[in-house]
Amino acid sequence: MTTSHSDFTLVIGQKNYSSWSMRAWLMLKFLNVRFDEVTVPLYGPESRRSVRALGGETGLVPVLIDRGTPIWDTLAIFEHLYENYPAVWPADQKERARARSYSGEIHSAFHALRGAMPFNTRARRRLSARTAEVTADIERVLAIWGACRGSPWLFGAFSAADVMFAPIATRFRTYDVRLEGPAKDYMNRLLEYPAVAEWLKLGEQETDVIPTLEIGAERGRESHAQPVET
């Protein structure tokens, strides 16, 4: 819990395992918004019920509670924050449209990458083999990074687009996806961003273990049969 007197409460899963919680948390940190933090352990028998009791109607994390009003789903949270914090998205209208499109793509696609490379910031392993689908997802990520010519971030200033890609950068680190040139530089900038580094440090301090996210590709795909975050 970051403060005892704030307008916002963020409901999240464990930092080591919840990529969508990471995105909402990073956004609030980037905006320098004070918030209380409630962690609901993922994949527990009462997980969804606990989230619903806190206002998240889907039972999925993250949920942002703004002065009593719950907002669930990461992109909905971003859009809600944008109403009062325009730094969420790029200032230029055309770039804002691209940033929203790329962020929506992350939200709706990259299923092969997520299935074969479960989010686990503590782990270090290499994939024994990459399927064509996983390779295509990785190549698409790199294509997006290459298409954005902003410096040092995708659209110049740090924005929601960078937040959305931060958990993918951690997956590349976990599974030793080796990059070169500007893509490697951008990944390292994401991993070194202060709020990202803080999240990773806090995740390393957690003691919870979710076996389906510790074993690898086969069990990882199984673990996504019943989503716990969005």
Features from the language model and the residues they span:
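A short, structure-level motif marking secondary-structure boundaries and short turns
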Residues: 8-11, 171-172, 216, 228-229
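Active-site-flanking alpha-helical
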Residues: 82, 168-169, 200
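GST-like fold's C-terminal all-alpha helical module
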Residues: 106, 110-194
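Conserved beta-strand edge residues that scaffold enzyme active sites
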Residues: 41-43, 186, 204
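Acidic/histidine-enriched, glycine/proline-rich intrinsically disordered or flexible terminal extensions
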Residues: 203-230
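Residue-level detector of family-conserved "landmark" positions at structurally sensitive sites
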Residues: 38, 74, 182, 200-201
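GST-like domain detector, emphasizing the conserved glutathione-binding G-site
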Residues: 1-131
